[in-house]
């Protein structure tokens, strides 16, 4: 006997009345207040007595008074008449009392008859109800027995009988709602118990679904195949009937759920073997805790009403939840997906939990909607994972998640916080055009292969602290609206930030770029911090704009470095920076103070046509290769104090608009060049020094004692003589011609 059947019978011991129940007595006891009064008991005697007595009094009393008291004849006749009236009245009253009592008795008898008839009817109704309930229980018992029948048609008939009995109990108006629910739940438990019952052939479903007999198959293939298909139909029928009676909803604009007649029941499919399709159904309170799915698990277009529990469920073959809707919480924690899992275009109205789930093959969540929190913490995706165009309306949790193969978060919308803390991406990862509307945490995340955030948008903070990028990292045209941190991040291969936008602070403190780092045409809206950053190979900041302070303090550039046409709007610091190879600042624009204090340039460095709008300091800088400052413009004070030029120092065509300080500079190999032939124009290109007011500090060309000297000559402008390098000229800072783009008042070359 099934467990559900035993519980059902135990429940009936308290529901069925015992056979010893006393019946309503047939005779009725007359109340004491309705007993016969004395005047009714002696009615005849009283009637005769009053009649005779009144008649005698009417004859004798007037006669006696006439005879002995001298009453007149007329008065005696009048008295006689009065006595007769009184006697008649008494008799009439007595008769009325008797009639009234009789009427009351008739009414009591009628009421008693009516009450007896009602009691008889109630008894008959109770007997009928007991008979109906007994008949239902008898049908229930037979239906439960049918579930164990060998014939599928008989089992199917038992299922339909049980389903009908549930509906009958719910429609039984003789029971209160609690009793209706209790009776129906007993049958529901039996149906769920049948779903949970083992079916050995389910383990052979892969062989039995083949068109031909597998060579290694043990058993009667044809018979087993037929039995499997029959049982699939039988068990699917249970879900069909449940679906018809479950809640309905529409999702045109918003999810509106309308309860069904079975919506208050509890359904338990835990540890059930599922080996049949469940697509196109409504499943309410789906509890598949520890369930095992043999063959493909098909839940396409299924509406899960209220919570759906697949905790530690095991999916042995492909899993299909395509376009399914989960109106309650969806729990797939620690579920095991052995083959492909497809949740494409699914909708999760409440929290979705895939914590520690294991996806052995491809997992597809493309275009799915997670309305509330989505948790994939510590989940494992062994093959490709696809979240393309999915929407996370609340927090997206990928804490310590492992993506062993390619993963696609392209065009995903993260509306709330996103957490990829210590997540591992073993293969390629794409976040192209993804939108992070709240804080995004990639702290200590590992990207083993290529990763792309191309054209992604981070509306709030982005944290990539101590993240590891083993292969190429692409942030091309990525937009960071708030603060972003790559502090101590490691880029082992190329890092591409070309045309990226950092609206707020960008922190690359102690970041390591193992190979090429590219920031071409990147925009830094606030402070950019590259303190102690390490650039392992070529790095490019072509046409990059730093709107606020830029800090490269003690950064290390291992290979060639280019800041070509870069714009530093505020202060920039390259203090103690080491440039190991060729470096270019050609046409760069420094609108704030530029600090190259004790920087080391171990290869050639070029500042050709660069512009320093404010103070520039090269104090103690070391240039081991050639240093080219030709046609550079120094609009404010420039200091090369204690700087060392081990190669050629080219200043031809440079413009020094304020005092130039070369005190204790050291030119170890050759003289500094302040004039040279311009290859393009064929003209001699001379450095220019502003004619400073007399109260200003003069240009200083007193080099270090062991240095090659700067050959000086003299020239004058406006009657003031200056010592400047031979061949260079003085100019009047106020003589700039905007049309000709040159100073018009120049001195003769210094001699």
Regions found by a protein language model. Give the residues of each.
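Membrane-proximal alpha-helical anchors
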Residues: 29-30, 71-171, 175
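Hydrophobic transmembrane alpha-helices
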Residues: 50-74
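Feature of secretome-associated and extracellular-like proteins
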Residues: 37-41, 56-64, 291
């Amino acid at each position: 006997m099934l467990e559900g059947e035993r519980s059902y019978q135990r429940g009936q011991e308290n529901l069925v009345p015992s056979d010893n129940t006393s019946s309503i007595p047939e005779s009725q006891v007359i109340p004491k207040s309705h007993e016969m009064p004395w005047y009714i008991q002696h009615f005849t005697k009283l009637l005769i007595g009053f009649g005779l007595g009144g008649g005698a009094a009417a004859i004798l009393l007037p006669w006696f008074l006439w005879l002995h008291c001298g009453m007149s004849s007329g008065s005696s006749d009048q008295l006689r008449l009065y006595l007769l009236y009184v006697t008649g009245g008494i008799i009439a009253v007595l008769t009325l009392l008797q009639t009234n009592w009789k009427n009351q008795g008739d009414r009591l008898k009628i009421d008693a008859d009516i009450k007896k008839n009602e009691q008889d009817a109630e008894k008959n109704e109770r007997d009928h109800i007991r008979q109906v309930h007994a008949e239902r229980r008898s049908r229930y018992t037979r239906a439960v027995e049918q579930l164990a029948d060998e014939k599928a048609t008989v089992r199917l008939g038992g299922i339909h009988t049980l389903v009908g009995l549930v509906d009958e109990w719910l429609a039984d108006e003789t029971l209160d709602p609690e009793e209706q629910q209790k009776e129906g739940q007993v049958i529901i438990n039996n149906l769920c118990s049948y779903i949970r019952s083992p079916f050995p052939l389910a383990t052979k479903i892969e062989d039995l679904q083949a068109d031909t007999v597998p060579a290694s198959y043990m058993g009667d293939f044809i018979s087993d195949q037929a039995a499997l298909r029959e049982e699939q139909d039988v068990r699917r029928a249970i879900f069909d009937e449940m679906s018809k009676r479950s809640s309905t909803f529409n999702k045109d604009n918003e999810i509106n759920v309308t309860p069904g007649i079975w919506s208050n029941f509890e359904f338990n499919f835990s540890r059930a073997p599922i080996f049949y399709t469940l697509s196109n159904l409504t499943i309410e309170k789906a509890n598949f805790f520890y369930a095992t799915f043999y063959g493909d698990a098909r839940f396409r277009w299924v509406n899960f009403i209220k919570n759906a529990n697949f905790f530690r469920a095991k999916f042995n073959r492909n899993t299909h939840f395509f376009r399914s809707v989960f109106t309650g919480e969806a729990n797939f924690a620690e579920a095991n997906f052995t083959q492909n899992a497809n949740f494409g275009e699914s909708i999760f109205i409440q929290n979705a939990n895939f914590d520690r789930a294991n996806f052995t093959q491809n997992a597809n969540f493309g275009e799915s909607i997670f309305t509330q929190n989505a948790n994939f913490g510590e989940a494992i995706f062994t093959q490709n994972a696809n979240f393309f165009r999915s929407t996370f309306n609340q927090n997206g949790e990928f804490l310590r998640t492992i993506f062993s193969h390619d993963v696609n978060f392209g065009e995903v919308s993260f509306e709330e916080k996103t957490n990829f803390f210590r997540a591992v991406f073993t293969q390629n990862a794409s976040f192209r055009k993804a939108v992070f509307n709240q804080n995004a945490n990639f702290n200590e995340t590992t990207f083993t292969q290529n990763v792309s955030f191309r054209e992604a948008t981070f509306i709030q903070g982005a944290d990539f602290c101590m993240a590891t990028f083993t292969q190429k990292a692409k942030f091309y045209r990525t937009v960071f609206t708030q603060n972003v941190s790559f502090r101590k991040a490691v880029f082992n291969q190329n890092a591409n930030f070309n045309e990226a936008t950092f609206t707020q602070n960008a922190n690359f403190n102690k970041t390591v770029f193992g190979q090429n780092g590219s920031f071409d045409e990147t925009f830094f809206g606030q402070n950019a911090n590259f303190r102690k950053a390490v650039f392992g190979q070529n790095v490019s900041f072509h046409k990059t704009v730093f709107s606020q302070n830029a800090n490269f303090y003690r950064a290390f550039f291992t290979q060639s470095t280019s800041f070509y046409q870069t714009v530093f709007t505020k202060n920039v610091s390259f203090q103690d920076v080491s440039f190991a190879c060729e470096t270019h600042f050609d046409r760069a624009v420094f609108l704030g103070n530029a600090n190259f204090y004790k920087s080391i340039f171990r290869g050639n460095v070029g500042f050709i046509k660069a512009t320093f709008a404010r103070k520039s300091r090269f104090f103690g800088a070391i240039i081991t290769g050639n240093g080219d400052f030709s046609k550079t413009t120094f609009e404010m004070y420039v200091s090369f104090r204690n700087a060392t030029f081990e190669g050629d120092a080219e200043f031809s065509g440079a413009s020094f608009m304020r005092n130039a300080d070369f005190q204790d500079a050291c030119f170890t190999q050759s003289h500094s060049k302040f004039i040279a032939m311009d290859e393009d124009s064929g003209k001699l290109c001379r450095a220019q020094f502003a004619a400073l007011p007399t109260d200003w500090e003069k240009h200083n060309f007193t080099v270090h004692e062991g240095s090659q000297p700067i050959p000086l000559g003299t020239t004058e402008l406006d009657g003031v003589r200056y010592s400047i390098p031979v061949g260079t000229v003085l100019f009047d800072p106020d003589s700039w011609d905007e049309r000709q783009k040159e100073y018009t008042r120049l001195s003769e070359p210094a001699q």
